Amino acid sequence: MNKLFETKQLTVLSRLQTSAKNLSGLLAVVAVLCTVSCSDTDQPGPQLNIDTTLGQAVFAAPGDAANAFALALRNGDSEMLSKVLGANYREVLPLDAVDGEDINNFNKAWEKSNDLLPQGEHKVLITIGEGDWTLPIPISEGESGWYFDVEEGRERMRIRRIGRNELAAMQAVLAYYDGQMEYAQADRNGNGMLEYAQKFISSPGERDGLFWEVGDSDKPSPLGPLMGNLSPGGGYHGYFYRILKAQGENARGGAYSYMLGDKMRVGFALIAWPEEYGESGVMSFMVSHAGIVYEQNLGPDGVEITEEIPSYNPGEGWLAAKEVSGPTIN
């Protein structure tokens, strides 16, 4: 795997940093959207009726469940939260990862708009704010009353995480495309040639990668400011990335190398795959200088499969991603 990551991972995608950070911040605190009640939390909290089979409180109506949840959060009452959501509530409600400013921001959003969104006859979701953000933990109706379905909430959070990471990955490969197109517009290393970068991060004092250090008044490198906490062998938003230096027979124009001597001048490509299949992502992605993002579900063996992919070759199973696309080259 060390060879696989010789070019390091794409952890310097600054043009995605702000949007991806906001996305991850929203999802990190989406579980604490209800820091005020679904009605008047100044009223005394409801008496909790514990269902011994579920191991948590059940309620006569979904609004009562929401009120109890909100009251517990507002008071920082971990004991009440453990009754409302169950003893393992921290698995879906990571309070230690949320600061007071985040909670205040969501309090304001809640005050602007909040509702219970029906999901059929026996389930509702709490929505908040003008954008109708939803708490991923549904309130479901069981035999003894309404309760927070933490098990389903955990699965909903997993799906959200995958969706968020896959969107970031698609944006990342397009950021790579944009960066390479910009990089090749000038002679970056003084050798008199226009070429594409063969790695993400430049060698110290050089401009042989898509990122290099710049001064305050200098134009940013193609991938912009360096993201913090670089980790060798690490991924970016749940995905690994590798630069490809050739293409196969299924690519537009047929099979050929992107290299002329030791310079990558003919084209470029990139492949991205999940760090942990089914948890950080499902789909793998590829892009080349043609500007089309392809995707495929490589399954649980995706890491091993990508290790064996020597070139950009979107053949059987690879489909053009509909969510994003770059300018195409005819």
Summary of predicted features, one role per range:
Residues 1-20:
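N-terminal secretory signal peptides that target proteins for export/translocation
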Residues 33-37:
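C-terminal motif of bacterial Sec signal peptides marking the signal peptidase cleavage site
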Residues 42-71, 153-178, 182:
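Short, low-complexity N-terminal intrinsically disordered segments enriched in polar/charged residues
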Residues 77-88, 194-197:
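Short, well-ordered alpha-helical segments enriched in acidic and aromatic residues
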Residues 89-135, 230-237, 242-250, 255-264:
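Surface-exposed, charged secondary-structure patches
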Residues 124-167, 171-174, 292-296:
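Short beta-strand edge/turn micro-motifs at domain boundaries
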Residues 183-279:
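Flexible, glycine-rich surface segments
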Residues 269-316, 329:
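C-terminal soluble interaction/assembly domains
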